[in-house]
Structure formats: C-alpha cells, structure tokens
Amino acid sequence: MDNCDVLIIGTGLQESILAAALSWQGTQVLHIDSNTYYGDSCSTLTIEQLKKWCGDVNSGKIHQFQDAQIYIPGGKQSNQYTSKDYGIDLTPKIMFCQSDLLSLLIKSRVYRYLEFQSLSNFHVFENDDFQQKVNATTKQDIFTDKSLSLMTKRYLMKFLKFLLLDPDYKQRVKPYADTPIQVFLQQEFKLEEPQINELVYSIGLSYKEQTSTKQALIRMKRFLSSFDVYGKFPCMVSKFGGPGELSQGFCRSAAVAGTTYKLNTNLTDFDPISKIAHFNDGSHIKINEKIIISPTQLPKFLQSSYNKVVENLQPYYVTRLVTVVRRDCKEWMSGNESSAIVVFPPHSLPTDNQHSVQVIIQNGNSGVCPDGQAIWFSSTVEQDLSRAKVDLESAFEKMETSLLRESSEEIVNDILGDNNNNNNNNNNNNNNNNNNNNNDFVMNAQGTTTPVLVNSFKLGSSLINFVPKDKLEIVCKLGYVEKTFINPDLSNIFKPTKTNNIVYKDVEDANNEIIFTNMPSSELSYDGIITDVKSIYQRITGTTDDFFDVDFEDEEDEYDRNNQPVVQPKRSSVVGGIVGGGSITSLTALREQHNENNHSDNAIDSDEDEDEDINDMNDNEEEDDHGRGPEPFGADEMEL
C-alpha cells in the first residue's frame, strides 16, 4: 500500500465508526492501533490484559489515563479464575432504544455482528437502602405501587402527562429553563424528594445536584421515549462487552468496505510537506488527506503540539472502580435480564458525595464473566480525585451490605448476634485473613504493594439494624482515572466551537493535516458519540450529507437468505424480543413485530379523567383501569 486518503490511529469507538463511514463512501483508509487488540480507550479486556494495561498506564505508555491500580486476592483457594472468561470494559456504557447510535447500527447492518440484551431495572439508593426501584413506566405501574400515596400518584401522573403530551410544554418550561430541576418539580407538580431523585438521577441519569430544568427534562424524555421501542424496557447492553464490541463491529464493517488494518503499529514520524508517514515496523505511506489521532496513542513527536491544542480546554476527570464479585446479583435484575443500574444521588453516601455515583451491574449471562459472578462498573465525575475514590469505595460498601442482607439465609441470627461464636472465631478469622492475603496480587500507580482503595466507613445502624458478618468474595478490583475534554453535560459536543472542542482545533505546523479526537465522555449512555464522529467526518469531507449514505438493502437481503436463524437452546429466554442469552437476526423486523403486537392506545391518554383513573385503581390495584395490560409512554421530541 503506497498511499491512502486518511490514516486513523486508534481503534476506539469514534475512530472505528469514522473508518466505516469513510470507507463506505470510497475513501481509502489505513487504520492502525499500537495495541494487539481492538478498542483503544474503549477496549474490553481480560484480567491478564488489565495487568499489563495498568503497567502501561502508569509508565506513561498509554496517555489520558492515570492512577491505574489492580488488586487480585490470591489467598483464598476459591479465587481461581481463567483470565479469558472475563471481558472488562474500560469505558462501559448503556444504549437507549431511541438513540442515534442504535439507528446507525441498524442502517449500517453492524448489528449483525452483535448481540443485545434488555436492561429495565434502575435503582436509586435512598435512606440507606435500595428500596426505590425505577420501573414505573406505565400507568399501571404507578397506580399499583403501594409505596406511593394516592396524592403522590396523582402528582406523578400529572408530570408524566405534561412531559410527553402537553402541547404547551415549551411555554411552561421556558421560565424555569435555567432553574434547578428540583425547583420546577416541587413548585409546578408538588413532587417530593424520593420521586424527584428517581426522575432526575435514575431515569435522567443526571450527575449533579444543580442540573437545569431544560437539561434534566430532555434526559427524562430520553428514557421514556426509549421505552417500548423493542419491548417493555428502555435500554439495552451489548453482550460480551460494551463499546469494545461495538468498535470491533464497525471495524469489521470498515474492512468489508476496503479499510486496511494494522495492529501493534505506531506512527513514528510525519512530514507535512511530503505527507509521508513512517511507522515503527520500518514501513511508510503517503497520506493524501488527513491523519486522525486518538489521544491515548499520541506519538512522541506530536506531544508538544497536542499540549498547545489542549492548553485552553477545560479538562474533566472520570474516576472509575471496577469490581468482580462472586455473586450473580439477580436480586437487582428483572426476570431473565443480566444487567441493572444503581445510582447514588448527591449526598446519599456517608461521604456526602457532591456528584452522583453511577453503577452498571452485569452478571455471567451477559457474557462478561462466568456464571454466578457479576461485574460492578462504578464511576463519578467528582473532580477532587481523592474524594472521588472515597465516594466510590463508600458506594461499593453500601452495595455489598445491601446485597448480603437481601440474599442472606441467616438474617435473624446475624441480627441477634452470636457473641460466643464470634469470640471463638475471631482468632481463627484473623489467622485465616493473614494467610489469605499472602498471595494477593496488588499493583498501584507507584508500583508498590499498598492495597488499592483501603478506605473504609462504618455503616450506620439504620440499615435495618443489620450488618452482615460476611464479605463479598472479590475476584478482581480495578481503579483508574480517565482524563477527557468533553463536558459531562455534553454541551461542547452538541454545541462545539473552536474554543471548546479538540476536534475543531488546528494543529500547529501540520498544514491542517492532523486532527485529534476526543476521549470518551463520562456519560453513562452512548449519547453524543455519533455527533462527535460527524464533527470529524465534516472536517475531513466538508459535509455530513453522505455520512453512511449507502444503500445496504441488497446486502441485507442476501445476508438474510444465507443466514437463516437456527433454533438452539439458550441460557436464558428472549426478553421482549431482545436477547436474553441468544442472538437476534433483525432489529427492524423485531420493532415491526412488536408494534403489531402492541397496537392499543397509549398508556397515558391526554383526554382521560385522572380522578377516575385513581378511583378505579384504588378499587382494584391488580388490574389496569381499562382491563388492558401495562402500556408504555409514547415517544416525544427530544429537544425544547
């Protein structure tokens, strides 16, 4: 290969989507990665790969990550694991069923390389427990929730009708647009703190207390409009891994379209005059148009240029704690699902956290770990990194206590306490603990053997006066910090300028040949990624009109003829048409089938009498007021 139009460095999700988009439009692309695997900053890694990754981060080989620490208990004989059985995402995300990325997966046919599973359980931590579970996505759910008073149900219904059906929506919101959402919900709808927390932090996945009304409502509508697109759930996760799996899917699509791939390859030099790029294997190539570079794989000769590009950009830090536990955590999941969301709102932890702690939980049925285990992906955008780590550890301890309390078969004995047994076992436990820690694998940022995140907090007596004696068995614990220039509210993605977004920054002495990409955002969903990619695409081609503007219909017909679905046993059943352990053949066909089977009126009817609804449900809370099953809210516009 003597020349190419575009050289892309890094196989992260943004770069992989870009490679596919360019290739399908006839652009000749060379796509390289310094790693031996795909995904870059979005990789899905095994435990052994994570050990090496931590070393590379702390040695400066991998940029934009820091403070990488891994702890693998080795004393207990039960902690025997097979590294390749784990797929741990560096930047885990969930996908709303109404989203640009999912639409692109369908349009580009990349979904054929992936499997999806439904996600419907969103939990909010409140009053030292996970008593509130966000599943009130139909009128029946709201009215049959015995934890809510009739008046609260009425206020909640008024708000949800307003959010999705009120023709005067914009006019009513306008005076509150920049006011904290809590004020709007309290003054206009008389909602109380528990309901506000669920709406803002779980359904809306807002990260801060002072989220504006305009932004919070858009986030809530995102959840509600995604419900019932493919089934009775708002979100999905990809099986066997998140963004890393999607990256590979788009790379495969790009390869089909003509992109050339080279892993374990670094850019060592580039002459902007001759446009010749040199690589670590001694090869070279002429670049006709642009070089796109992921910040994690920044060549040494461009370090000073990169520093100048970002010197006036606001950095944001995302602190993450990933814990693999020997519990499947089914207590927090619905039916045959294998994932759940847990959110700790601001000020809900003993550490008085200033920002939300958000947790994605996935168990063995998602393909990311063995059966009977689960991975907890927790994160926070707290900018005080010391405090962020303390918040994450506190959230872990709360989850641990709650899970053990819910699943314990000896709660009564633990509450009463067996002092004699405790006293007799103390010495033995201490000796066992000492022996168990002898073989622990520990790596921290300094290369020493200090345990990771050693802070602990005593749990209060408010946890139903029960603190389990046992601890969760941990397979692996990983902590690290990611640096990004994307605002957590995604404002500089949806409203980018040359002063707030790295993609639009010119690189000095590069003749406008080099573009740096953004690191992944702190956003828990995939929102903003397609917009970000389109920004790069436009800088290369001058327009986004032809972005994936390809007719895939003929290819789809041929694929369907040659790949008839094979019925085979699945570990779990299909939930709402999305995988619960098996595969799907056509998301579009699935949506059409779901719409045909769900043709009755919307769950919220604008002309219904609300008092009659409440009275009917009060008479018989086990049935819907019209004798129908639960139905979803309808989709609405996503912008004010």
UniProtKB/Swiss-Prot annotation:
<dbReference type="InterPro" id="IPR036188">
    <property type="entry name" value="FAD/NAD-bd_sf"/>
</dbReference>
<dbReference type="GO" id="GO:0006612">
    <property type="term" value="P:protein targeting to membrane"/>
</dbReference>
<dbReference type="GO" id="GO:0006888">
    <property type="term" value="P:endoplasmic reticulum to Golgi vesicle-mediated transport"/>
</dbReference>
<dbReference type="InterPro" id="IPR017230">
    <property type="entry name" value="Mrs6"/>
</dbReference>
<dbReference type="Pfam" id="PF00996">
    <property type="entry name" value="GDI"/>
</dbReference>
<dbReference type="GO" id="GO:0005829">
    <property type="term" value="C:cytosol"/>
</dbReference>
<dbReference type="InterPro" id="IPR018203">
    <property type="entry name" value="GDP_dissociation_inhibitor"/>
</dbReference>
<dbReference type="GO" id="GO:0005092">
    <property type="term" value="F:GDP-dissociation inhibitor activity"/>
</dbReference>
<dbReference type="GO" id="GO:0016020">
    <property type="term" value="C:membrane"/>
</dbReference>
<dbReference type="GO" id="GO:0005634">
    <property type="term" value="C:nucleus"/>
</dbReference>
<feature type="region of interest" description="Disordered">
    <location>
        <begin position="594"/>
        <end position="640"/>
    </location>
</feature>
<dbReference type="GO" id="GO:0007264">
    <property type="term" value="P:small GTPase-mediated signal transduction"/>
</dbReference>
<dbReference type="GO" id="GO:0005096">
    <property type="term" value="F:GTPase activator activity"/>
</dbReference>
<keyword id="KW-0343">GTPase activation</keyword>
<protein>
    <recommendedName>
        <fullName>Rab proteins geranylgeranyltransferase component A</fullName>
    </recommendedName>
</protein>
<feature type="region of interest" description="Disordered">
    <location>
        <begin position="414"/>
        <end position="439"/>
    </location>
</feature>
<feature type="compositionally biased region" description="Acidic residues">
    <location>
        <begin position="604"/>
        <end position="624"/>
    </location>
</feature>
<feature type="compositionally biased region" description="Low complexity">
    <location>
        <begin position="419"/>
        <end position="439"/>
    </location>
</feature>
<dbReference type="GO" id="GO:0005968">
    <property type="term" value="C:Rab-protein geranylgeranyltransferase complex"/>
</dbReference>
<comment type="similarity">
    <text>Belongs to the Rab GDI family.</text>
</comment>
<dbReference type="GO" id="GO:0004663">
    <property type="term" value="F:Rab geranylgeranyltransferase activity"/>
</dbReference>
<dbReference type="GO" id="GO:0031267">
    <property type="term" value="F:small GTPase binding"/>
</dbReference>
<comment type="function">
    <text>Substrate-binding subunit (component A) of the Rab geranylgeranyltransferase (GGTase) complex. Binds unprenylated Rab proteins and presents the substrate peptide to the catalytic component B. The component A is thought to be regenerated by transferring its prenylated Rab back to the donor membrane.</text>
</comment>
